[in-house]
């Protein structure tokens, strides 16, 4: 079994759980985006002594975003620190382009492409420095529901020393917002897949109005 936790794990108890999962044949990856996060993981793992280093993915982010490294230089500093850790194994890179928006609520491709290029550049630089852990394959992952076709196209052309596995993380927990994705998705009103593959609204939610405190507000 393989699971990607698309977040940093910095709570000691949760890090201990991850360490124990390694001894049970369970392959789990989490993100790393700071020296502070590395220090927390090192401190906990030094006490737990996992059977092998915990695999982590270096996370890139965008200005104003929730997480992730903002620049190539910052990313390489963190990658070098992971490579020095006896308890962590740098096994790939990651990012999330889904929150990149322009022209109101409708995402556009250009800033997404620039962000993907940044992930590619960081991956190449880490690979050139030999900081990726020798493993059966290198994982590069991004995810969003509007431009996953761009993600696959750009990341799958990466050339690395290790075999490459591209993972897309598109899809919400239960359902999507049909309104915005009907316009933006490569399987929306204007398909970009080369086929007439269109997403169809499959869930309708009913609710009860509890209050109308003022005109036009419910």
Predicted segments, located by residue:
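Active-site loop/helix belt of alpha/beta enzymes
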Residues: 55, 61-193
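Acidic (Asp/Glu)-rich catalytic clusters
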Residues: 18-25, 42-54, 79-89
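Glycine-enriched alpha-helix->loop->beta-strand junction motifs that scaffold or abut catalytic
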Residues: 1-3, 22-27, 46-53, 108, ...
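Short glycine-enriched loops at secondary-structure junctions
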Residues: 8-11, 36, 96
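N-terminal active-site wall of soluble small-molecule enzyme domains
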Residues: 1-22
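Short, charged, surface-exposed secondary-structure boundary motifs
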Residues: 13-18, 40, 177-181
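Internal, well-ordered alpha/beta segment that forms a basic, Gly-enriched binding/recognition surface
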Residues: 26, 30-52, 60-64
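Flexible, acidic glycine-rich loops studded with aromatic residues
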Residues: 196-218
């Amino acid at each position: 079994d393989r699971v990607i936790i698309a977040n940093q794990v910095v709570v000691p108890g949760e890090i201990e759980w991850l360490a124990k999962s390694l001894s049970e044949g369970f392959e789990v990856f989490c993100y790393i985006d700071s020296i502070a996060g590395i220090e927390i993981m090192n401190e906990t793992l030094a006490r737990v002594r996992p059977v092998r280093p915990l695999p982590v993915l270096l996370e890139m982010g965008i200005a104003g975003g929730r997480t992730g490294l903002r620049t190539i230089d910052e990313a390489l500093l963190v990658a070098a620190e992971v490579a020095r850790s006896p308890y962590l194994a740098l096994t790939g890179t990651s990012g999330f382009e889904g929150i990149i928006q322009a022209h109101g609520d409708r995402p556009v491709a250009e800033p997404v492409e620039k962000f993907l290029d940044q992930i590619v550049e960081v991956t190449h630089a880490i690979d050139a420095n030999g900081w990726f852990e020798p493993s059966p394959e290198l994982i590069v992952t991004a995810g969003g529901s509007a431009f996953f076709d761009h993600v696959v196209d750009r990341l799958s052309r990466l050339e690395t020393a290790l075999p490459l596995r591209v993972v897309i993380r598109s899809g919400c927990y239960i359902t999507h917002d049909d309104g915005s994705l009907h316009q933006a998705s490569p399987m929306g009103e204007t398909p970009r897949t080369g086929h007439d593959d269109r997403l169809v609204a499959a869930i309708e939610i009913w609710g009860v109005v509890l209050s109308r405190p003022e005109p036009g507000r419910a």
